[in-house]
């Protein structure tokens, strides 16, 4: 594959117009863009062979005969592509005692491998259908100083923020996977289930709630959110509950 990259940096503190200022001891602005390829993709995941039929698919006269049909699917898996843009700022101040590094990143994964279910089947077929966005920043603060001649110390703080979002699923709005879901506009592999909104406290409360009555719930049982308001807790009431990303 072809994976180009480019980067540039500007040490602003060395410019003539910065010579008279007293705040920055060092100031640098940098930016880069690059494309990466992920080849950790199992080619066999892009192949599926589905057999349908049963032992009595055909009838001839008074006899039944087995009949099966085999359908083969190919998705022709390719490498995932990752386009990443980084913008950073480095500066030192207070006679180089305070050093600050700030980085912003925008990482877009194209041709991400996802595995939707095949039509009329429980089998899945991996393909380059997805587009995933990761963006955020990293901040590092370091203070270096000394007390007297013999005691030196360093204090550091690191902060990070990451936002993950599914941008595209090959035309699908979501792909469910048991307790997780990939949904356009949400975080990758979000937790998916029923939201607990309380606990039934008394028999009277249970008797007045049609959901509790229908499911023989008693005080101490969880109360789940009825998302569509139909007084029935079923699969239509499952929702995104959060993400494994802190």
Describe the function of each predicted region:
Residues 1-193:
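Extracellular/periplasmic, surface-exposed regions of secreted and cell-surface proteins
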Residues 54-70, 182-244:
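Flexible glycine-rich, low-complexity coil/linker segments exposed to the extracellular/periplasmic environment
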Residues 154, 245-246:
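Conserved C-terminal beta-signal and adjacent last beta-strands/turns
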